[in-house]
């Protein structure tokens, strides 16, 4: 692993772009709606379905597990893999922590409301409207939510996720300094130039969409 070299190739306006995105997110009233789901609740924790508004006014959803015993608890926020089916936290164990499992826009619990088609290619010709701009902001809104809850110990908010969830974990931890730790594994959506040279998928989908949109590969990479 020490021999792997991947030069930095971020755009000059990278941080300005994400700072503006965070500013726009902060202007969206979250309108949290928290509904107990009795069939998912158990002996140790209650499980709730949460709805909230994210960047661009998009409604996103997730499952929130809270120990029945009163107290302040650390929170683990889980970001899901690409097209993964949303699972609920186990309500009969892990009484030492809260858990929030987020479905980003168009995926998981939000699949019935998906307007993005092939998520990772949506808006590929315009970084302002690219799918993962909003999806990355969804990860921050999830952190906003857990920190808004009285049961949360604000000193101990942890992020984790694999594949797409690993990428979302890295993005959220980079953009939000309120978190205490992050555990990404097999992260997807990174180092695209090398990635697409090594394996066919999903580069073949991106290349086909670039042709469909009439943009060059370099323009595509600038969005990514």
Feature annotation, model-predicted:
Residues 1-45:
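N-terminal targeting or regulatory segments adjacent to alpha/beta-hydrolase or S9 domains
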Residues 62-66, 71-83:
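Short beta-strand element of the alpha/beta-hydrolase
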Residues 85-143, 193-203:
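Cap/lid segment of the alpha/beta-hydrolase catalytic domain
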Residues 131, 163-167:
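Active-site loop->helix "elbow" adjoining a glycine-rich segment at hydrolase catalytic centers
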Residues 151-162:
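Alpha/beta-hydrolase fold nucleophile elbow
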Residues 166, 170-219:
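Hydrolase active-site cap/lid region
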Residues 221-224:
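Serine-hydrolase catalytic core
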